[in-house]
Structure formats: C-alpha cells, structure tokens
Amino acid sequence: GAVETLQGKAATGELLEKSVNTIRFLAIDAVEKANSGHPGLPMGCAPMGHVLYDEVMRYNPKNPYWFNRDRFVLSAGHGCMLQYALLHLAGYDSVKEEDLKQFRQWGSRTPGHPENFETPGVEVTTGPLGQGIANAVGLALAEKHLAARFNKPDSEIVDHYTYVILGDGCQMEGIANEACSLAGHWGLGKLIAFYDDNHISIDGDTEIAFTEDVSTRFEALGWHTIWVKNGNTGYDDIRAAIKEAKAVTDKPTLIKVTTTIGFGSPNKANSYSVHGSALGAKEVEATRQNLGWPYDTFFVPEDVKSHWSRHTPEGAALEADWNAKFAEYEKKYADDAATLKSIITGELPTGWVDALPKYTPESPGDATRNLSQQCLNALANVVPGLIGGSADLASSNMTLLKMFGDFQKDTAEERNVRFGVREHGMGAICNGIALHSPGFVPYCATFFVFTDYMRGAMRISALSEAGVIYVMTHDSIGLGEDGPTHQPIEHLVSFRAMPNILMLRPADGNETAGAYKVAVLNRKRPSILALSRQKLPHLPGTSIEGVEKGGYTISDNSTGNKPDLIVMGTGSELEIAAKAADELRKEGKTVRVVSFVSWELFDEQSDEYKESVLPAAVTARISIEAGSTLGWQKYVGAQGKAIGIDKFGASAPAGTIYKEYGITVESIIAAAKSF
C-alpha cells in the first residue's frame, strides 16, 4: 500500500535531522519576521509533524480537496507555523515561501491561527482550544459513516484516517472531553490523536493547574493509549506508535508524546516564554548555533527540497489510483456510486425542494418543532448527506429521522446521531462533518437557550463556513412552566449580531419548510432555526418564497404602498400581529402585516424590494417578538414601537406569561393608537 511506499522512502540520519530542523527554522524565522506568533510548539512537534506528512499521511498537494485524503487537524492552532511549514515542504501551492514571509500579515494565506477558508490544506479552523479535536471527531465520524454505508466486500472505496495534534490547553477544555467521550463510545478506530505533552502552559508549568493522568482518563473514555517518552528525537518510537494505533481498529488512539517546547533553543526551551512570542534575534542566533543551522532565513536545503518533492507525483498517483478504483466501483454499484458522488461534490439531487411539505391555512395547526420534524424526514429521503441528532432531547426537539436507525459503533451507516448531553461537543462535531465533504448536511438540536453551552462551536461554524443546521426548539417564554432558566430572551439578537450565520424564526408550516430550503442551500453559512414548543396555526399569506427574502408582506388592505400602519412579527408572534391587524382593520385602518423570518436575508435584498415591504414614508411601525427588543429600532424606526421582553422569563403556563408580559393583541392595538 501507499503508506508502506512512503515509509520505504523515509528520510534517515542526517537528512532526517536536517528536514526536521528545516521545519523548526521556517517556524522560528516566520515568527521572528512577524515579531508575533508561537514558535514553541512547532519546535517541539516538528518530529511528529515530519513523520506524519512525510511518511504516513496520504494526500495530493496539487489537489488539497481529493476526497479520500487523510485529514490532519492542528487542534493546538496557535502552533500553525508547524502546519504551514509542512504544507510548504509537501508542495501545496497555498503556502509558498512568500506566504511564510507574510505570516500573520494583512491579506496573507498564513493567518495567526489556521483558517480552512484561507489556506487550502487546512481542514478546519482552529485556535479556540479544544475545537480542533472535536472537529476531528466529526471528520472521523463522517469517514466511518461513509465507509459503513458505501464500502463493499470487494471495494473499500472510503478509507482514510484523521490525525490530530492537540496540547495541554485542548486537554483542559470541557469540549475535548465531550467529543473524546463520544469518539470512544463510537469506536472511531481511524482517529489518531497526538497529545503534545510538554508540561508548559501560558501561566507556567502545568503543575499549577493540570495534574491529572490524561492517559488513564482516555482509557476510561474507551481509547487505546500509547506513550512516546522521547518526542524530541525518538522517530522510531513515533513510527511504532502510529503502526500500533492503526492495528487497533475498534478504538481511537491517543499517543501521548512527551516533548520539549521550544526544542533547540538554549535559553528558552522548556519555558512558557517560548510559547507565544518571538525568540528574539539573539536567541535565534544561539538556536542556530545549537542545532548546527548555518543557513539564511527561510532557507530550505536542496537535499531536503528534493526529498520532499516526491510528494507531488506520489500524491497524484494516490488520487489516480483511487479514481480508477472508483470507476470500477461505479460499474458494479451504480446507485451507491451516484449517491456517494453527490456527497463528495455537494450536488443536490434535482427536485429535492419538491419533497418539502406544503401547508394551507386549513392544515391542522402544530408546533413548529413538529413541522420541523416533517421537513427533516422529508429531506432525509432526498438529501443523502443529511445526518444529525440532538443533545439527548430528540423526543422534545423532534429531530428523529424515522426511516433510519441510530449511528452507533456497529451501525455506522445509520443517520440518527445520539450526542448525549454534550452541546458544545455536538456543535464542533457537526462542524467536522460539514467540512469533511461538501454534500454533508449535518444538523444538531437542543433547546434554544442552551446555545449558550455551544456558542464557541457555533461561532466557528460561522467563521469556517460550515453549513450546519441548528434546530433550536423551545424558543421563547412560549415553553411555559420550565421557567426562566429555559426561556431564551437575548438569544435571537445575539445570533443576529454574529457574522455569517442565518437566524431564522418561522411562524408556521410553510415558513418552516422555507427555513429548511434556505438552510440546505446555504452550504457556506450555518443556519439556526428557532422553533416553538407551543401549537401555532398555519397563517394565510405565508410562503417558502417569502422566507427566502427574509421579510415579506403576508396581508395588507391598503393600496399604493401606503398603509396607515405596518405590524411586523416573527415566529409565534406573527399570529398575534395578524390578529391585531384584523381588529384594527375593523376600525377602518389600513394595516400591513410583515413576517420577518430573518433579518440577515432581508438586509441582503435590493433597496427596491425593502421599500416595497417597509416604505420609508410609513413611520407608524410596530414589531412584536417574544425576546429582546434590541435591534428592532433598525426596522421600526425612530417613531416606531418595539414590543418584546427585556427581562428574564417566568415559570407559569405559557398563556399567562404572554399576558403578564404584554405580548398580546391588546399591546399592539394600544401602540397603534399612540401614533
């Protein structure tokens, strides 16, 4: 196999040392030139990085997106010069010498923490500690799922590994334990994590706050563990550990690699000062002397260059072999091949939108969480990459795909993922699934208020263009008796403030279907669907097309785009807006009702369209939403009124809270009379 070929050409002796030192000095020089960055980790992890990229991993540097590549995640994202140096040596066009010299500068392809959308070859965006290892669990889940679903006894078409380097900081974060607990439970045998055990944290030696036995904890989580005691020069030990890890196919492996942070620096090695700042000219010189490195800055010695140059033809050959294998597979298993292809490319089957349910005002009213389940189940039949689940609330979030079983260790082809009560890990795992292949459409669910437990991962979804669908139910005081700990208030506006994420709050069946259409189409932008626990009617005038515009008129008894009053609402309050409009019309007023499903989508429409919905000449405007009023001023204007909730909720039947908090038809009518 390819791995053996690569290992057969491994660098040894002097060339190996030279190659590893090249990695170290590219990192040192880039950090020094930027006068900013983290040299310590790349200096300490260069040996394991070298073994992975030069001897073990399968990839094609000229096509960073080849489907069956091994994935590498640098969870300790601050050490990104390690990865940039490796991508540069391996021949990726995304990291040329000039890019290394532009490390951490405006517009460069080598940002201060790895960003998948900036640098082809970087799989996921890391930096907030713990996110990367959790993303890697998602990548490994995706591989295990596709392998179980598409491999045949005579054709292993999906077969790649996920490698991670994580540090002490990642290990301390709760998200890492959540995700690694699931990885052990799922038996993700193709996930191999290297724990850079260097005993240094930013505030000093890890003795000050981190003294647990990490390996024993991982064994308890169901991982295989190995300890490489000399990560600085123990190349054969690193190689043997990887071989052993691959032989254990039913468990993920943690390889604890004890390293010296800043290895080679005579005065700063093994100190926290080498973690996050440049060595300084004097210490760089001392390190050059110490490691016997007589070369100029950013220099790659000829023999090192020529040794690494083989990855370009070998990578092309690996991909060509796989393509030939896939062509054979296609002949034998045409249907499966077509499905797998759509997950690989992200091309949705024609007519998938027609699968979404349609509703009329006569359809029986229902909670939008239940309508969401109808949409999810309809989509699961036509969107092959739809996969997901809930943080132990599937029966409350209504996210079960009824035609599939549970994704488990021995039933990895199934599409219901049981995340357990692990919101943060769930979000980051879904990011990994989304970024594995363009045709994956992962969704995850909990109560909307508990997005507070997963915001770190949701922000990374938005930043890294991971099209995760967040199915967030129990979206307001409308959930009733569970009270203020469970009732979202500030959540809608907080996500509207977050860049590159769609906040959708549908009011009924057609709007829920529209929200799903938007969410599935936005593969580079995550979506949050805020859904009700309480039953709502299907309103006249709502539509899928309207949702796509973010805000649209559902009823209007005026002419010439000049109503006396505009009432806008979202979700469960749209019904209240519509009822109030009916009352006001009986009194002779002309009233327009606007459904405002998504601020972001509305803001993206043309000025003409916005004027057709919210004409500037009409200043009598009212908004109603069971959440914070912050931000509504933008749409109701200086003369308008925003009805909402700017305090915590309460424990009582939902109807009572609505009344006590003034989220009512009467409040709208009173506000209308004040104009």
Swiss-Prot record:
The record marks 38, 275 as: Important for catalytic activity. Its EC number is 2.2.1.1. Thiamine diphosphate binds at residues 78, 127-129, 169, 173, 198, 275, 423, 450-453. Binds 1 Mg(2+) ion per subunit. Can also utilize other divalent metal cations, such as Ca(2+), Mn(2+) and Co(2+). Binds 1 thiamine pyrophosphate per subunit. GO terms for biological process: pentose-phosphate shunt; reductive pentose-phosphate cycle. Belongs to the transketolase family. This is Transketolase, chloroplastic. The lineage of its organism: Eukaryota, Viridiplantae, Streptophyta, Embryophyta, Tracheophyta.
